[in-house]
Design a protein with these regions (language model features):
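Recognition helix of helix-turn-helix/homeodomain-like DNA-binding domains
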Residues: 25-41
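Short, charge-rich amphipathic interface segments used for partner binding and complex assembly
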Residues: 48-62
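Short, charged recognition helix plus adjacent turn
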Residues: 13, 27, 32, 59-70
Length: 70
């Protein structure tokens, strides 16, 4: 689960649909990755693209720190 990314998305008002459009995938795929519903994470290139386009003022390591679901 990418809790930091989820929190910052809410603050910056960025949607799963916007991330999906940037990455060329469905919003549900983005949601599943961010919420930890799948074992797959973001590819490094995709994480860099998300950070550069939507969250340039936040560190990549902060945004994409994985947290385990309880």
């Amino acid at each position: 689960m990418y809790q930091n990314l989820l929190d910052i998305m809410k603050i910056e008002k960025i949607t799963f649909a916007q991330l999906g459009e940037l990455l060329g995938c469905r919003y549900q795929t983005v949601s599943d990755i961010i919420n930890g519903s799948t074992q797959k994470g973001f590819y490094y290139e995709d994480a860099m693209k998300i950070q550069k386009v939507f969250f340039p003022k936040y560190a990549l390591e902060f945004l994409f720190a994985k947290m385990n679901r309880i």
